[in-house]
């Protein structure tokens, strides 16, 4: 799942070397994955009224559900 998030984030931002994806918390119900990008790219990842980040979260949840797990995405 981290690979999918990294791929999507790298293609959204201007500074792909600043993209950092790592699991924040992993309990028996869900894994929370944190996405960190450069300050200048934060608006691109969030999007207008949060549309881009909502789309990212939907893709990640769909991929996780397909694998039988639950993953939540946080932009840190």
Feature roles, as predicted:
Residues 1-42, 55-76:
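RNA-contacting regions in translation and RNA-metabolism proteins
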Residues 46-50:
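Glycine-centered tight-turn and secondary-structure capping sites
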């Amino acid at each position: 799942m981290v690979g999918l998030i990294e791929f999507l984030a790298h293609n959204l931002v201007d500074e792909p070397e600043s993209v950092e994806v790592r699991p924040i918390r992993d309990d028996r119900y869900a894994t929370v994955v944190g996405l960190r990008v450069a300050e200048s790219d934060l608006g691109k990842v969030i999007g207008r009224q949060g549309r881009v980040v909502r789309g990212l979260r939907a893709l990640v949840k769909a991929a996780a559900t397909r694998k039988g797990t639950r993953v939540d995405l946080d932009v840190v």
